[in-house]
Amino acid sequence: MNNHPMPATDAASASDIISRIGSLTRMLRDSLRELGLDQAIAQAAEAIPDARDRLDYVVHMTAQAAERALNCVEAAQPRQNELESSAKALKIRWDEWFANPIELSDARSLVTDTREYLAVVPQHTSFTNAQLLEIMMAQDFQDLTGQVIKRMMDVVQEIEKQLLMVLMENIPDIPSKPQKPTDSLLNGPQMDKNVAGVIASQDQVDDLLDSLGF
């Protein structure tokens, strides 16, 4: 282990860096407090875990609905396959009978099988209808998750607004950029097109961040 003392110049340099970082941190906190942004940023930071929980909820509800729908399809498909195969077999037998009428006993057997098939059709269709209803009910997650996603969008927009306020209030003057003839930012970044000096669109947000070098 190296026990040699740190050179005085290195120690002084490290102490100076720490002191400057502390001063900058204090200045930033004081500025935020004076601007009234400290509470707003704290609220935005607190919203992040809540947003994560809401996203987890959306993922859970979506997966649950998908699983319910798949289970219904898997339950109904064998019955539909059975109806299809039985109907095809009966059609072949009836076509053969019409092409070459068979003896009465064989015809009676064909009629009996057809009646049995017709008797089970309502059972299968009723079961399938129940599965279709379950699939439809599984889609109710969209109503709930839609509300959650809308709340998430509000949170993200609020965080973005608070961070932009910090940037706009605590940065030096930004050199003006050449404007295109069709540029809508003739009066600088705006957040409300009805109020001067406020950002109105995502393009203007991107323009501000780009001008800051972010």
From Swiss-Prot:
One GO BP: regulation of chemotaxis
* Principal localisation: cytoplasm
Q: Which UniProt keywords apply?
A: Chemotaxis, Cytoplasm, Flagellar rotation, Hydrolase, Protein phosphatase
Q: Secretion signal: which residues?
A: none
The entry lists its GO molecular-function terms as: phosphoprotein phosphatase activity
Residues annotated as site: Enhances dephosphorylation of CheY-P:
Q147
Query: Per its database record, what is this protein's job?
Result: Plays an important role in bacterial chemotaxis signal transduction pathway by accelerating the dephosphorylation of phosphorylated CheY (CheY-P).
Official protein name in the record:
Protein phosphatase CheZ
